[in-house]
Amino acid sequence: VGSEMCIRDRTAGILPINVQKSGIDVLCFSGHKGLLGPQGTGGIYVRPELSIRPLKMGGSGIRSYEKEQPAAMPEHLEAGTLNVHGIAGLLGALEYLEKTGIEMIYKRERELMHLFLEKIQGIPGLTLYGTDDLQQRVPTAALNIGSCDSGYVSDWLYENYGIAVRSGAHCAPLMHEALGTREQGAVRFSFSHVLTEEEVRIVAQALREFAEEEMQQ
């Protein structure tokens, strides 16, 4: 019987999960997205009964004269010098999340996303991807303007308004294959709880300005 592995690269710190109820044996997560930690951090949950072979060996510090990693977890998977600065930063982020409240943060981010989706309605040439059910959306929005390359849209927003968005394939090639956007990519907007409603309105207006200029050409 195989093991159940789950990748939570983008939803850790955003959506709740119970590994026992979900029957997950291995859970991998990134630390620099929903958990607000530094880049280069992340973690892995391994069901205690599961045996995993280390990808790398050596430099464990506590077993310097042995070729094999210590049997105990998590040292079993921790070869070499750890990213102590990154781990400290991730700890600080987790403490902030615990103090502020994940539910409060998520609620605020969704409110800002809803405002953005409301303000971009009617933008010429706009294609919004994902479900129309706002309750099923996480606080991101992926879209395109006509046939404009997503990188071009991203550059325009940054150069004219200092707005930073993500363009391209977003490490999701199969999704773009399914959407037919392999060459164009998509422009992704992510909403932080520290944004203001006025900033969201400015972003929506900038996108409208870009679209109206492009559609006139």
Where are the predicted features?
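Conserved PLP-dependent catalytic core of the aminotransferase class-I/II
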Residues: 85-86, 90-137, 156
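Active-site PLP attachment segment
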Residues: 22-66
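Helix N-cap motif at beta-to-alpha junctions
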Residues: 146-150, 197
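PLP-dependent enzyme catalytic core of the Aspartate aminotransferase-like
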Residues: 159-160, 164, 176-217
